[in-house]
């Protein structure tokens, strides 16, 4: 069976996108892992599936699979690529696109300059919703490993995030602390780990160790998580530039009770076919 796909990226966070409306594709976990291999497959951080909506008041259903084959709740950079893909492939001509995901609904806006704004919904700081093992909600949590004690914020952006503030993003122990915290017992569903350097109240630098992927060039939900945690800790204002290794995103949030909005690029690289 030949499957049509597009390779896309958002600030270097790269995706294979499959139209599962005009095709009928089912991929096993082993097949996804094989396709994700950058030497023997296509190579990607996440695989995105475009599916028919589950509800008549939505345009599409959006599914996300990590490179390790696990289906996850949310991917912000992927959402921007999803929006560009469905327009590019003629699946819709709308500039405002509504989609369902495993963790809730998103609204995607195609901007005049070609960038995409995503209404990411409301952040959730309740430990049980992240999920994080904690007796109560805190601004900062103390998390201990055998050799390290870290102070972090935690939030769900539809998926679990832990954010650490660091003095210098270039020397942050991403490769050491990333996997330790991702798989820490206090995160029952594992977590994405952000390392945030505050440059000013409207500017941060960020590296993200993504759950099931390792460090990526960009993470949209990670950028949102870092911004909202910095905001509630009174370190950031309501509009922030987030510099990631792959480029910059603009994140806007007016505080609890309001949705987070993320704006950034979505790039098409090539189309192809793969035999399953």
Curated annotation (Swiss-Prot):
Top-level taxonomic group: Bacteria
GO molecular function annotation: diaminopimelate epimerase activity
Keywords: Amino-acid biosynthesis, Cytoplasm, Isomerase, Lysine biosynthesis
Listed PROSITE patterns: DAP_EPIMERASE (PS01326)
Residues at which substrate binds: 13, 46, 66, 76-77, 159, 192, 210-211, 220-221
Site, as annotated: Could be important to modulate the pK values of the two catalytic cysteine residues: 161, 210
EC number from the UniProt entry: 5.1.1.7
Subcellular location: Cytoplasm
Chief location bin: cytoplasm
Function in brief: Catalyzes the stereoinversion of LL-2,6-diaminopimelate (L,L-DAP) to meso-diaminopimelate (meso-DAP), a precursor of L-lysine and an essential component of the bacterial peptidoglycan.
The protein's assembly and partners: Homodimer.
Family (UniProt): Belongs to the diaminopimelate epimerase family.
Record-linked PANTHER family: DIAMINOPIMELATE EPIMERASE (PTHR31689:SF0), DIAMINOPIMELATE EPIMERASE, CHLOROPLASTIC (PTHR31689)
HAMAP family on file: DAP_epimerase (MF_00197)
Protein name per UniProt: Diaminopimelate epimerase
